[in-house]
């Protein structure tokens, strides 16, 4: 396995390649959701590069940057077993050599970034756009693989790529779930046993709302029912909303292809999920 920690070695390797390259950016602590993205990349490109970097720029004050799980040796083993042969593991000194307080920032489109997670995490998506812009310039892939679990992030990056005329195709990877329906997340390991037993109710609630989202259903009534269900189970909901899948504008009435989005805390852990109306 080739592991690059500097830009010079990475670019030398990149220039030697023949054929398409897919980039799968991650923050490590890899799980089956990440590995599914790696497999998707291998099916769509002749070469795959996985980046592992916990980006401090996308964490706000009081968030879990210091405690975010860092499991590099385990991640490399999982990638090796999945057939991935090339990994980029930059550090803060490489990504932000002058520090993080006075750097050029890539601002996300306002209409997509001020709602949902952006409403409670100011600066988060600017951090995401900045680090992904840097990675795209360093790696120069033909394909960028992003999961639909972070659907708002996916839409923001798709729009950023279009707005900045970046020469890369953004390819979505379907959201992956554990056997009981809970969306895979690196933060799931922080759930205690009791919380882990309750956690799948977030997905159950969204799937139930999607099934009940008929043409004449009132979104406000559906959302209120789902919100109450989550609260009864011990969640502290942050949002539960039906939005257009492209514009992320809120909807008063269901429509095919729209998505239900939810964020809720269970104990100290913030969970997010989304389900499409089929």
UniProtKB/Swiss-Prot annotation:
Documented EC number(s): 6.3.2.1
Which molecular-function annotations from GO does this UniProt entry contain? Answer: ATP binding; pantoate-beta-alanine ligase activity
Residues annotated for (R)-pantoate binding in this entry: 58, 153
* Pathway(s): Cofactor biosynthesis; (R)-pantothenate biosynthesis; (R)-pantothenate from (R)-pantoate and beta-alanine: step 1/1
**Cell compartment(s), UniProt:** Cytoplasm
Q: Which parts of the sequence bind ATP?
A: 27-34, 147-150, 184-187
Q: What is its main location?
A: cytoplasm
**One GO term of the cellular component aspect?**
cytosol
**InterPro entries xrefs:** Pantoate_ligase, Pantoate_ligase_C, Rossmann-like_a/b/a_fold
Q: Which residues form the active site?
A: 34
Write out the entry's keywords from A to Z.
Answer: ATP-binding, Cytoplasm, Ligase, Nucleotide-binding, Pantothenate biosynthesis
The catalytic activity, as recorded, is:
(R)-pantoate + beta-alanine + ATP = (R)-pantothenate + AMP + diphosphate + H(+)
> Has UniProt tagged this entry with the keyword Ligase?
yes
- Chain sites annotated for binding beta-alanine: 58
Q: Source organism's superkingdom?
A: Bacteria
Assembly and oligomerization: Homodimer.
Q: What else is known?
A: The reaction proceeds by a bi uni uni bi ping pong mechanism.
What does it do? Answer: Catalyzes the condensation of pantoate with beta-alanine in an ATP-dependent reaction via a pantoyl-adenylate intermediate.
- Family the entry assigns: Belongs to the pantothenate synthetase family.
Could you tell me what this protein is called?
Answer: Pantothenate synthetase
Look up and give the organism this protein is from. Acidithiobacillus ferrooxidans (strain ATCC 23270 / DSM 14882 / CIP 104768 / NCIMB 8455)
């Amino acid at each position: 396995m080739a592991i690059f920690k500097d830009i010079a070695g990475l670019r030398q390797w990149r220039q030697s390649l023949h054929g398409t390259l897919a980039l799968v950016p991650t923050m490590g602590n890899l799980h089956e959701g990440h590995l599914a993205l790696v497999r998707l990349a291998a099916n769509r490109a002749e070469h795959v590069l996985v980046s592992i970097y916990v980006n401090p720029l996308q964490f706000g004050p009081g968030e879990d940057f210091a405690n975010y799980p860092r499991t590099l040796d385990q991640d490399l083993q999982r990638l090796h077993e999945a057939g991935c042969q090339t990994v980029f593991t930059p550090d803060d000194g490489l990504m932000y050599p002058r520090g993080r307080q006075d750097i050029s920032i890539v601002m996300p489109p306002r209409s997509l970034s001020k709602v949902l997670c952006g409403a409670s995490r100011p600066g988060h998506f600017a951090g995401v756009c900045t680090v992904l812009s840097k990675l795209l310039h360093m790696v120069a892939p033909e394909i960028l693989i992003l999961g639909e679990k972070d659907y708002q992030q996916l839409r923001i990056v798709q729009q950023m790529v279009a707005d900045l005329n970046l020469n890369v195709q953004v390819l979505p990877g379907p959201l992956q779930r554990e056997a009981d329906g809970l969306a895979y997340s690196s933060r799931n390991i922080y759930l205690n046993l009791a919380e882990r037993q309750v956690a799948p109710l977030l997905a159950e609630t969204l799937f139930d709302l999607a099934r009940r989202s008929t043409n004449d259903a009132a979104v406000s009534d559906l959302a209120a029912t789902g919100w109450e269900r989550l609260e009864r189970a011990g969640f502290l909901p942050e949002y539960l909303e039906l939005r257009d899948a492209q514009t992320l504008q809120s909807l008063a009435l269901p429509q095919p292809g729209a998505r239900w989005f939810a964020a809720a805390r269970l104990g100290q852990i913030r969970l997010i999920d989304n389900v499409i109306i089929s």
